[in-house]
Amino acid sequence: SLIQFETLIMKVAKKSGMFSYSAYGCYCGWGGQGQPQDPTDRCCFVHDCCYGKVTGCDPKMDIYTYSEENGDIVCGGDDPCRKAVCECDKAAAICFRDNKDTYDWKKYWRFPTKNCQESVPC
């Protein structure tokens, strides 16, 4: 679920997903099109593609199971769809953490959609 995604971002990247990634670049936030603008925006592009491959559940609403083991997030549960959503969220949170040094709020926050025209395939 989006609430769990926010929680994973806080745990892994130590930032608020809502305040840092909900309207960033061409892909962070609702929807997405165009070229990813920087490594953080690419994290969101890959996350969108990951959600697009998930079938059988609603990635934004369904609750998944995970645990923390030795500082790592471990996705669990019996539902393969929900587990896949967890893996998508975990990968994005790690990507955000690993690209914090190139995050550019001033340049890409509320980035104009007119600059996000030429889409790329997943």
Curated annotation (Swiss-Prot):
Binds 1 Ca(2+) ion. It comes from Trimeresurus stejnegeri (Chinese green tree viper). Snake venom phospholipase A2 (PLA2) that shows a moderate inhibition of ADP-induced human platelet aggregation when tested on platelet rich plasma. Exhibits moderate hydrolytic activities and prefers the anionic micelles (dPPC with deoxycholate) to the zwitterionic micelles (dPPC with Triton X-100). PLA2 catalyzes the calcium-dependent hydrolysis of the 2-acyl groups in 3-sn-phosphoglycerides. The active site is at residues 47, 89. Its EC number is 3.1.1.4. It catalyses: a 1,2-diacyl-sn-glycero-3-phosphocholine + H2O = a 1-acyl-sn-glycero-3-phosphocholine + a fatty acid + H(+). The keyword Lyase does not apply. Ca(2+) binds at residues 27, 29, 31, 48. Keywords: Calcium, Disulfide bond, Hemostasis impairing toxin, Hydrolase, Lipid degradation, Lipid metabolism, Metal-binding, Platelet aggregation inhibiting toxin, Secreted, Toxin. It comes from the Eukaryota. SMART domains: PA2c. GO terms for molecular function: calcium ion binding; calcium-dependent phospholipase A2 activity; phospholipid binding; toxin activity. This is Acidic phospholipase A2 CTs-A3. Belongs to the phospholipase A2 family. Group II subfamily. D49 sub-subfamily. GO terms for biological process: arachidonate secretion; lipid catabolic process; negative regulation of T cell proliferation; phospholipid metabolic process. Disulfide bonds join 26-116, 28-44, 43-95, 49-122, 50-88, 57-81, 75-86. It is found in: Secreted. It is an enzyme of class 3 (hydrolase). Expressed by the venom gland. One of its GO terms (cellular component) is extracellular region. InterPro entries: PLipase_A2, PLipase_A2_Asp_AS, PLipase_A2_dom, PLipase_A2_dom_sf, PLipase_A2_His_AS. Its cofactor is Ca(2+).
